[in-house]
């Protein structure tokens, strides 16, 4: 509730983060003074739904949950998107375009490592949720924290990456698609891997 509102895109930089206090660009140009990863899947898809989406081979993101001792999810990792990015200033999942022939789990973990400094060995994927469009798809990879993970913004795509209490997620200005998906994703986190597309190795469902 102390976070900047949706109109506040000029987030002050923390001192001493190595960027020298450069102004936050207001134009949709990737800053050149911060790391930015590229894959062969980077690019827009003109979708038959009438919109365009990022990721020539689809996209994926990581929904990483921290649970309390009784297994109840208490926080998830969210990314505060850089002002220059699509729907800049909103909060969503660390993730991005899949590389050619890259499966969604691999891609989501790769992007989470690149953007949020999340070590894949600290994470256990538990399931996926796929949003299908005519010419594109987005896979949310649900995962549990198995070793303490301290995410941080590690490239140009994030203003901030942090644990957000589950009960506070809906109060943030969310990326539209993530906001639409959040009620179902939250239910799935709470219910555990109870659906048909739970990953092999998850808890038995029958
Ligand atoms: Zn579409």
What is the meaning of each model-derived region?
Residues 92, 156, 177-178:
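Short, glycine/charged-enriched secondary-structure capping and boundary segments
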Residues 1-90, 96-148, 194-206:
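N-terminal leader/linker segments that precede catalytic domains of diphosphate-processing enzymes
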Residues 98-100, 171-186:
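Short, surface-exposed secondary-structure junctions/capping segments
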Residues 129-156, 162-168, 181, 185, ...:
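Active-site-adjacent beta-strand/loop module that shapes the phosphate/pyrophosphate-binding cleft
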Residues 111, 115, 176, 185-192:
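Alpha-helix boundary/capping residues
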